[in-house]
């Protein structure tokens, strides 16, 4: 049996506020939606310009096959000792350096990739 829109509205109108809230939650879960109202932007409302990221984190995703070369590259970039650099490489994925400029991050990524590592900038 299929209900008409009028029958559904009438049935909802007979429910208490708490029952309607429960119904909304059930509908959100069932259909994977939210009941938040859509806000229409006026013509004068412009989207704010996306700020360019200024600080990056260099993340060693994978050391690759040339682990010794990657350890050397990590030591050069960070100034860490052999043991500490090896721990960073062995612990991949992990952070190599944080809060660096875009230029430094790109240079570090290039050096690590040339050494055989897979690198991400965040």
Swiss-Prot record:
It holds the Pfam family Ribosomal_L12_N. Homodimer. Part of the ribosomal stalk of the 50S ribosomal subunit. Forms a multimeric L10(L12)X complex, where L10 forms an elongated spine to which 2 to 4 L12 dimers bind in a sequential fashion. Binds GTP-bound translation factors. One of its GO terms (molecular function) is mRNA binding. NCBIfam families: L12. It comes from Stutzerimonas stutzeri (strain A1501) (Pseudomonas stutzeri). Forms part of the ribosomal stalk which helps the ribosome interact with GTP-bound translation factors. Is thus essential for accurate translation. The lineage of its organism: Bacteria, Pseudomonadati, Pseudomonadota, Gammaproteobacteria, Pseudomonadales. The keyword Ribonucleoprotein applies. The keyword Ribosomal protein applies. InterPro entries: Ribosomal_bL12, Ribosomal_bL12_C, Ribosomal_bL12_C/ClpS-like, Ribosomal_bL12_oligo, Ribosomal_bL12_oligo_N_sf. One of its GO terms (biological process) is translation. It comes from the Bacteria. GO terms for cellular component: cytosolic large ribosomal subunit. Keywords: Ribonucleoprotein, Ribosomal protein. Belongs to the bacterial ribosomal protein bL12 family. This is Large ribosomal subunit protein bL12.
């Amino acid at each position: 049996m299929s209900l008409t829109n009028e029958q559904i509205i009438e049935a909802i109108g007979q429910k208490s506020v708490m029952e309607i809230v429960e119904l909304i939650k059930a509908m959100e879960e069932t259909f994977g939606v939210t009941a938040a109202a859509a806000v229409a932007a006026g013509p004068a409302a412009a989207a704010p310009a996306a700020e360019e990221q200024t600080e990056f984190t260099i993340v060693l995703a994978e050391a690759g096959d040339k682990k010794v070369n990657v350890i050397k590259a990590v030591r050069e970039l960070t100034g860490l000792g052999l043991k500490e650099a090896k721990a960073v490489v062995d612990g991949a994925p992990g952070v190599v350096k944080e809060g660096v400029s875009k230029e430094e991050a790109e240079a570090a990524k290039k050096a690590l990739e040339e050494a055989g590592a897979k690198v991400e900038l965040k």
